[in-house]
């Protein structure tokens, strides 16, 4: 096999993230067997034109996800070679078609494996099968075209793998399945899109790190190789450190990296001669120390290495030398050389060659000397002083104080100037730069805080004033809008009544003229020699004895009603013309019979007995004028599949697998806290009950108004909106009673000594008709809200009645249900011409005889969807039914009555106030007069709407054969609402059953294809593993394992060490640089 050409040392030649300048060398590897990477046989198809070939070849290269250098090399190949490669790849893709070529198959398998929770160990064959499936996925992620990996990512395949890793039991975690799952992630990271997806996933690196808890050495090695390689990827180093911190909590480690050092130190059992794990651990440790922020920051390397030294890594490294493994020794050399280099550079800061970090005395002296003549020295002394004061108890939590201090100092050291932490932040939202800036500007911040507090208070005051003005403006705007609406309605009504008045006046004039003409003719006919009929006659004398003139017609009645007809003429006169039908009368259709003649139905009979539909038949004498006279269910029998209906609902059929292919406020109130208490001053005078006075004080404190302001608001009918509706409701609870007023009058000379509540009640009692004024004001503020609550209920009844009366879909559905019932029921229960609408909710009670999960309702929906698609608009045609079903007519009448009585009470108070002499500032009469005008018309409009709604409801009830006086709207519409809900649920259940069946069929089809192709797949997988080169991520892992990543740095360190040793030989300070045991 021809070796791959490497472009240089270090890691720049390995990973696509680190580009080099060398062009890749493409080699073609042939094998002895029939499976090889690029076959040299001539393509079976002729080569297309060069332009078309380039387009086809470009699509192929895109699927291979090559780097830019490799893409250029591929496009530089001759046209014949391009065509050969294209045909070879397309042939492989054709051979690989099958169940295992679909990412969906592997995702289903992963989900089913992860979902299995069993205490019993898997059988050997089953475990082998699961392992083969995971291995197959790993191979597919490495060898399949780019679209396979993209599809796998789009279907969230990574989350399926991670979920399996998180939920696997102990046996699985110790098996080959665990190793293969890690291999799948590794294979996914060989692809640029897959690698980006893994790194972008919020949990991926953490879940991978959790696999370090296994005892399976191969799995541990694979995990460490992935984590080490991620350290080399931009942005990956910090993710790895965060993952190790996550693993500390997951494995309950005392400190981070504890498990790694323990595994590195183990030398018994399976760990005795296991060099690969120890090499992987040292490779990971070197990657963590030298990459990320460790590339530039000495302080970060010292900080991170100190964690390993505290865990005792140095004695372990000395012991690892006994293995005498060249690859392991290379990693050990790099660790020690980098440590010596860093400690020497750190010592130069203090003009020393070495600092003994095990000596607290030396480190203290160096710190003290450094700060002695600086401004920081007093703070250093303060730190020492307070450290001496730190509480200390052997059994207490004292160590947590020192841990906090340690973490703060660590973060101060490693955090960069931008406030970014290269390591996982031990203290969240702790930005050193911001903290220092705050300390520098502490006095300035204090001043700004005081100024901000002052401005906040001013802002709150302005906000309160603004809200008050907004409330006042909203109230005025609402009043204006209501007045305009009322004015427009009154204008429309006046125009309508004027037109009606003119029409009636014209009718009266016409009738009067006809009456005079008829009377004249009658008189002429009764007088001999009188003018012949048709001759013009003179005026009738005003006083003719025995005159047969009828009295003049009465004037039209108010409201546009017609006057009563004139009295009948004397015998012999022509009969009067027939009068117009009464308003609102419904004329019978032309040719309609006076009685309802029912023709006998021809209903097909089932061959076997069927389950019955428990409906309530409508008596034939109640059919006239209902919807049932317009329904002919015999037409339905020509459309229905009666054999299928008979088979599904047979009374004696055995149960079997069956699937129907079909679709299937209370308000919370706030309570006033009555448990607060207040103390009265010693000299205050209070004659009111203590509990009542206490609650009154609470209310006044919430109002934040003086007694004069409250009094002015009541007299002006709160034109400035100082009193919210809830406060008015509470004020009504504290109206002065007669006993209170008498007591307060006795002590009115001691007004200055009165308590706050007493003074309030006393001053309110001085207002004429205070309680009636307060009630009128509260009613005025609540009127629009109450009307707004009533109108939707009235509108719901009106629109709901119209919808059920006019719905064509409902009528068609009733026809189908009637046909079902007549076909399924026999005897007295059958041969029906209609049924009560409550029977609709009994359809679901009839179960199928072959599947208890299928009801007559499910079957009905199936028929409707297939035969009567127009019925599917039923929910749209009856969209207001749910709201109408919530309306209780008794409560609605009660609300209307409350409005009527409240309005009457306000009118009574208005008449009283008009009779009283006006007081300064009293605007009750003007404000309430205007309100009464608007409110009376609005209430009249509501009453008219309610009357119309009741008429329509009565018409709808009779239309369905019900008795209007015995059924209320909530019950009537509730029947339809319940039925609509049942239909929706049944449609959803049908849809779920359909999806379930399709899913089962798909799984069966995929399993069958998998079984047929298993042998060929095994051969292909083996060929692919041998023929395909390792991906970029594999190259990176391989370089980490061998230590090639650190070759360049190691050579540099050796040169530096040699140079430093030469310098030290010439120096007076002779101190050999050796390994440091910690």
From Swiss-Prot:
Amino acid composition bias (Pro residues), ranges on this chain: 530-539, 548-585
Provide the tissue specificity.
Expressed in all tissues examined.
Biased amino acid composition, Basic and acidic residues: 987-1027, 1067-1078
Q: What does this protein do?
A: Binds to disheveled (Dvl) and Rho, and mediates Wnt-induced Dvl-Rho complex formation. May play a role as a scaffolding protein to recruit Rho-GDP and Rho-GEF, thereby enhancing Rho-GTP formation. Can direct nucleation and elongation of new actin filaments. Involved in building functional cilia. Involved in the organization of the subapical actin network in multiciliated epithelial cells. Together with DAAM2, required for myocardial maturation and sarcomere assembly. During cell division, may regulate RHOA activation that signals spindle orientation and chromosomal segregation.
Organism encoding this protein:
Homo sapiens (Human)
Family membership, please give it.
Belongs to the formin homology family.
Its GO biological process terms?
Answer: presynaptic actin cytoskeleton organization; Wnt signaling pathway, planar cell polarity pathway
Query: Which GO CC terms are listed, alphabetically?
Result: ciliary basal body; cytosol; glutamatergic synapse; membrane; motile cilium; perinuclear region of cytoplasm; plasma membrane; presynapse
Q: What is this protein called?
A: Disheveled-associated activator of morphogenesis 1
Is Coiled coil set as a keyword in this record? yes
